[in-house]
């Protein structure tokens, strides 16, 4: 007997936990467990205004998105953002639920230029990440 996929399944509503949808051995889960991301806030606090301007993008998210791009060999920030829109593991890693809007790809260039130009913040942040990851079973950090 032939079975047909019902189009109705596309419109079903399910109550899901994103944490359960990301495998326990997923690379991003392992990295997230290995790193205490709060160190980034201390490094960048003098680059943000606390009183004026529009709400900023979370600096941890600003670092995690290019990390996803690098780890998964995505060629451009524009494509990275498109991938994040549909990838549950990426959203989980970034702390976004399925309805949260993914930042526009141009947000990154603007933030990097305005906040991090002429600094070594990225080097400090990624050195810290590599050090933290080196203590996990991802010891081949030389390849990162």
Where are these regions (language model features)?
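Residues that form generic nucleotide/phosphate-binding pockets
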Residues: 21, 30, 34, 43, ...
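Alpha-helix initiation and N-capping motif
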Residues: 15, 24-28, 37, 41, ...
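Conserved small/polar residues in nucleotide/adenosyl-binding loops
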Residues: 136-143
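Charged, often Cys/His-bearing segments associated with DNA-binding zinc-finger transcription factors
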Residues: 1-36
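Basic, low-complexity intrinsically disordered segments
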Residues: 48-56, 70-128, 132-134
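Basic, short loop/linker segments at the boundary and entry of helix-turn-helix/winged-helix-like folds
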Residues: 29-67
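Short acidic (Asp/Glu) and glycine-rich catalytic loops that position anionic groups and cofactors
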Residues: 9-12, 42-45, 105-108
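Short, conserved catalytic/metal-binding motifs centered on acidic residues
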Residues: 26, 63-65, 80, 104-108, ...
